[in-house]
Amino acid sequence: MKKMITLTMIKNEADIVETFVRYTMNYAYKMVIVDNGCTDGSREILEKLIEEGFNIEIFTEANVFYEQMFLENKYIRKINATEEFDYLVPVDVDEFLYPQNGNWSIFEGLPQNQISIIEWKTYCLDEEKSIQNIFE
């Protein structure tokens, strides 16, 4: 199976971060998460997931103002320099990759060294939706 690493930046995502990690680890080999100053328990949730055995690396960038593009590029370069992988996927904490028919093997056929587009669903909490039914 191809090795995929995801890169995610978070700030105060306690309502979704555990579900995001558990779902994403269905296809990711490792998750790199950049904590941009969480104060709602998100980091503690991630640390408990690491204790459970999830392959997560957390970096801290607690900047009040930041340009996401620059931070993402910083960590893309860092990952490229320190990790062995087949694919690197920047994904937001509210984005759940969702291949057609739930066929995760689609990742095996993606070409390397170029950009690919993968379907995803976005999680938004409101009175009508919950994480259990976003894939309906």
Task: Identify the residue ranges that each predicted region occupies.
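Active-site acidic Asp-centered loop
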Residues: N36, V91-V93, E119
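Active-site beta-to-alpha loop of glycosyltransferases that engages the nucleotide-sugar donor
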Residues: K2-R22, G37
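Residues at the starts of beta-strands that form the adenosine-phosphate
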Residues: K3, Y29-M31, N55
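Gly/Ala-rich phosphate-binding loop of Rossmann-like dinucleotide-binding domains
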Residues: M25
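Short beta-strand/loop segment that forms part of the nucleotide-sugar
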Residues: Y29-G37, F59-E61
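Active-site-proximal specificity loops/subdomain of glycosyltransferases
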Residues: G41-P90
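Catalytic-site signature of metal-activated, phosphate-bearing donor transferases
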Residues: M69-I76, P99-E136
